[in-house]
Structures are given as C-alpha cells and as structure tokens.
C-alpha cells in the first residue's frame, strides 16, 4: 500500500464516522502549491461555502499558496463565510492528512474565526 492509498483509507474511515453522526463537515485538500477548504452539508450533497489559496482575492495577498500563512488565511476566510451562513459547529475532515503544518494552521485559524470542532 503506497502513501496515497493509505491517506485515502484514513479519509474513508473518517468520513464514515462523520456521516454516521450526520454533521456538517469542513473538508480540506492539500497540494504542494495550494490548500482548499469546503464546508459540506450533512447529507454530503451540497457545498455550502468554500475558500482556497487559489481564490482571486487571496492570491493577490499571498506570495505563495503552499505556506502555513496561506492556510491560516484560508481558514479565516472560510470561518467568515460560515458565520455569514449561520454555521458555527462543523466536523473537521482532514482527508487523511496529518494534523500538522498547513492542516493545523487552517484548523486553528478557523477556530479563531468562530467555528467549533
């Protein structure tokens, strides 16, 4: 089993637990160049809010989209959008990535912005 398959296996287990609780989830995806985050409805069918380091407004502010500073900016932006929609509690879906570095920076910024998980 290679690294990607292991990550996908971990993600599948996490998503199954979140689906069983029927919680709104904050899903992330990390690449070398950018980080993406979405708030997905409890049924898993609708993206309610999204933010990424590749968005036009953030791209101008960031020198590089693959840094912890970029991840923190994405987390803060997503928390603002969620507050606008009245979402305060979510389940954090780290998509099998380690809770370290950019993933942790995004999560902490989202918490500071008012999201609870």
UniProtKB/Swiss-Prot annotation:
Transmembrane segments: none annotated. The keyword Ribonucleoprotein applies. Disulfide bonds: none annotated. The keyword NAD does not apply. InterPro entries: Ribosomal_uL18_bac-type (IPR004389), Ribosomal_uL18_bac/euk (IPR005484). One of its GO terms (biological process) is translation. Coiled coil: none annotated. Keywords: Ribonucleoprotein, Ribosomal protein, RNA-binding, rRNA-binding. GO terms for molecular function: 5S rRNA binding; structural constituent of ribosome. GO terms for cellular component: cytosolic large ribosomal subunit. It comes from the Bacteria. Part of the 50S ribosomal subunit; part of the 5S rRNA/L5/L18/L25 subcomplex. Contacts the 5S and 23S rRNAs. Belongs to the universal ribosomal protein uL18 family. HAMAP family: Ribosomal_uL18_B (MF_01337_B). This is one of the proteins that bind and probably mediate the attachment of the 5S RNA into the large ribosomal subunit, where it forms part of the central protuberance. This is Large ribosomal subunit protein uL18.
